[in-house]
């Protein structure tokens, strides 16, 4: 497979690797981007890739809490200009409040909003503003108490990142602090039990290969038993601590894990939602000359 400059650029952006290292990784893996990331990591040339986070779409995430229930809704637009539009913001707020009454995105589209369905309201707003919009997803969470936080707030309850945290027990403010922590650290899951097993296994494979290659290149190689029973488990323990919410060091007090901070506050964190605008979406790229030609032809 031909390795293009764009492929090298994307790999460098996602891993922080040097240009020649990125090119070699893609060559060695026949252009497979995921395999190239793993190849770089086994060579110690890239950090662990967090869950897919390339953000290219515009829009807003809305969050809303009612008692022990919280919802997050993402609505995408084509441009950030529209995301700053008061009518668009009002629409997203309305969709978010409507989400409290339903359990999934299809039910939300059919939900009533001032005598019209959410879907009808969306289509009418598209016609007025003149830009395509998408009601992309919603998430709902519940507990004894739920706290919400928005990062890069555009208005009350609206922003580029929305977080919900559900706790068991009487919340004394810790849930909001944890929500802010989640916005910053982007954990993969609540606990080890909630992690995707394929993600854990992939990490184990990378760490095993890396440890074996480092040991083979060492002037004083360690016995295989040390690699298998000490080094690899130690690295996996670190991976789990860094990528699970309960295992992470609490940003507000790094002397405690999030689990320990919650316990001290007398609550148990039972779930969270972190929703970022455009997560996993790529904007359609168009050649500039083709774009100009298209504009002139139109």
UniProtKB/Swiss-Prot annotation:
Signal peptide (UniProt feature, chain positions): none
Localization terms from the record: Cytoplasm
Main localization, broad class: cytoplasm
Family annotation (InterPro entries): EF-Ts_dimer_sf, Transl_elong_EFTs/EF1B, Transl_elong_EFTs/EF1B_dimer, Transl_elong_Ts_CS, UBA-like_sf
UniProt KW Transmembrane helix keyword: no
Gene Ontology MF annotations: translation elongation factor activity
Keywords: Cytoplasm, Elongation factor, Protein biosynthesis
Region (Involved in Mg(2+) ion dislocation from EF-Tu): 79-82
One GO cellular component, as annotated: cytoplasm
Matching Gene3D superfamilies: 1.10.286.20, DNA helicase RuvA subunit, C-terminal domain, Elongation factor Ts, dimerisation domain
UniProt family annotation: Belongs to the EF-Ts family.
Annotated function: Associates with the EF-Tu.GDP complex and induces the exchange of GDP to GTP. It remains bound to the aminoacyl-tRNA.EF-Tu.GTP complex up to the GTP hydrolysis stage on the ribosome.
NCBIfam families in UniProt: tsf
Protein name in the entry: Elongation factor Ts
Organism: Cereibacter sphaeroides (strain ATCC 17023 / DSM 158 / JCM 6121 / CCUG 31486 / LMG 2827 / NBRC 12203 / NCIMB 8253 / ATH 2.4.1.)
